[in-house]
Structure formats: C-alpha cells, structure tokens
C-alpha cells in the first residue's frame, strides 16, 4: 500500500517500542517516518523539517504531546500540521483538552494498522483535502 508514499510523519513517543510499532504500521501504509523520543526533540525536528503529520504521545518527558500541539497551533507557519495524539486511556478530560487545543484526532494504545489507517484517512482527507 502506498497511498501515503509522498508523506512524512513525525512520531513523538518516549518509548522506543511504541515508536517502532507505529513506524512499522506507517511504513506499511507508505509513509516516510521521522522519530523523536521527547517533546523538545520533536519541536526541533518540526522546526527544521517539513512534515505532513505528527503523531505524539500525550505523556512524554520535557514536553508532552499536548504541549507540542499547543506550540504548533500557536505558530503561524506550523499551525496547519495535522496532529494525532496517542494515549493509553481515552480519558474525557484529555480528549477535551486535545480538542480545545486543536488536535485532529486521537488513538488509544494499543491500536492496529486498520485503526491507524482509518484515522489517517479521516485526518488527511479532512485536513489536507486529499481524497483517498
């Protein structure tokens, strides 16, 4: 499958196993992937590299996925990058905060390639105007 072959996703998660699983799933869908092990590193990559999508864990050291989202949405150049937050539990408070800050969607860990693909299709079609 290569419907996302010209797209780059940054995966920000402090657990290398989670990054690897998400990366493998994204590559299976055709994405090129970059990785960050914390929020500060993610922001550095975002400021230096063009990405089409950010998938960030809600809970990370230095800067959480929520803080990265807030920083991106406050930046005139970066504000349109689609952001999917990942979390272990779908707590209403966290989801509401993410929505208030402008997250595009969320995934609850663990998730499979089918669920990831479903969320990606929705986000990419809605936010980037590309029908898949």
Stretch-by-stretch model annotation:
Residues 16-34, 101:
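Two-component/phosphorelay signaling modules centered on CheY-like receiver
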Residues 30-37, 45, 107:
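Short hydrophobic/Thr-rich beta-strand motif most characteristic of the beta2 strand and flanking loop
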Residues 49-55, 60:
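Active-site beta3 strand of CheY-like receiver
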Residues 111-120:
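C-terminal output helix
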Residues 61, 70, 79, 91:
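The feature encodes the CheY-like receiver
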